[in-house]
Amino acid sequence: MLSSQTSSIFTVSRLNQTVRLLLEQEMGQVWISGEISNFTQPASGHWYFTLKDDTAQVRCAMFRNSNRRVTFRPQHGQQVLVRANITLYEPRGDYQIIAESMQPAGEGLLQQKYEQLKAKLQAEGLFDQQHKQQLPSPAHCVGVITSKTGAALHDILHVLKRRDPSLPVIIYPTAVQGDDAPGQIVRAIELANARGECDVLIVGRGGGSLEDLWSFNDERVARAIFASRIPVVSAVGHETDVTIADFVADLRAPTPSAAAEIVSRNQQELLRQIQSAQQRLGMAMDYYLANRSRRFTQIFHRLQQQHPQLRLARQQTALERLRQRMGFALEARIKQATQRQQRVSQRLSQQNPQPRIHRAQSRIQQLEYRLTENIRSRLSEQRERFGNAVTHLEAVSPLATLARGYTVSTTTDGKVLKKIKQVKAGDIMTTRLEDGWLESEVKSVTPGT
């Protein structure tokens, strides 16, 4: 009889191991509520305590890497909600739970509801970015849905008055805490949409516990915000408080004051922007005028450089240089001829060739005469060419035309007026006379017949 059952015999170690595996695999992770007792924290930083109710108790451990995420200090007798894994301590055969997270019992139940509703609405797409409405910029009227006696309303109105005193504000007073609050918030959102007075809504309240903020975790409020045709800015609690309303709203503000900052324009900043734009415009105008003045000066200098008198002066200078060069050349030729004559005379005096001397002298005289006549002819030609050039320049000079009573008119950008279609009534034009300029306004334009 004993031999047939030997395959079912467990050692104590194997039994405890098998039970541990069954507990861990079958039970998995569970939520347990109970009262804390025998709480200890050794130097290792781990927590050891007993979780009990009226009729039973279980040993619990919460290791340091998990308990450092707990936001409160557990106390003896405190009711808590623990998320834990069930296991068995094999050396003693004691089963225990290993806690992963811990919350006060009341908040823990609310947190469970919060997570369940969040998952549900997220699955339905209420949090999707594609459904978010664009906030008006700027807003012309702001609706505020909150308690009329709360600090949140005071903060919102204070910021709006400071930033944009002229911005209209409509208050839709509601309860923000208690059983009636979700229904009132929903009705206020629906009323604001029905009246259509505002182009943006701030829905929120001041900070508080999870229970205090629970109205903004209500499914009815979330669906009313999602259905609102008016963009909604949520402003619930402090920056660390995140509600279901924050996920559904078109934009979440960390605080009520921040919501007021978001929906309003800063008039002082707007004034500074206008002043900055005026300064930039003034600088642009100054630069344009300076550039046009510089351009006018350049054109004026070019016209001066092309003045007939300057051209005549340059021609006279060139002619004088030519005359000097010709004089120097003549003197050099005469000097060379004289020197040659002297050398020849010296040789002839030594050889006494009188006939050759007479011929050479005659030849020299002829050369001197021809050279002199050639120089005189060249000088006469140059004087004649110079006179013709002067006559031609005076004939084509704009000043000569102006001296005969004609004028030249130009537009403000320096273009010479040739046809009446270049101007229209009201334009300013500049007229050049012989002795100066006139600036005039075109009163009318009449085509020629």
From Swiss-Prot:
Q: What class of enzyme is it?
A: hydrolase
> What keywords tag this UniProt record?
Cytoplasm, Exonuclease, Hydrolase, Nuclease
Q: Which reaction does it catalyse?
A: Exonucleolytic cleavage in either 5'- to 3'- or 3'- to 5'-direction to yield nucleoside 5'-phosphates
E.C. number, please?
3.1.11.6
Task: Give the UniProt subcellular location, in the record's own words.
Answer: Cytoplasm
Classify the main location.
cytoplasm
- Entry's Gene Ontology cellular component terms: cytoplasm; exodeoxyribonuclease VII complex
**An annotated Gene Ontology molecular function:** exodeoxyribonuclease VII activity
Checking InterPro entries in the record gives: Exonuc_VII_L (IPR003753), Exonuc_VII_lsu_C (IPR020579), OB-fold_nuc-bd_dom (IPR025824)
Q: Name one GO biological process term.
A: DNA catabolic process
Q: Give the family from UniProt.
A: Belongs to the XseA family.
Concerning NCBIfam families, the annotation shows:
xseA
Protein's name according to its UniProt entry: Exodeoxyribonuclease 7 large subunit
Q: What is the lineage of its organism?
A: Bacteria, Pseudomonadati, Pseudomonadota, Gammaproteobacteria, Enterobacterales
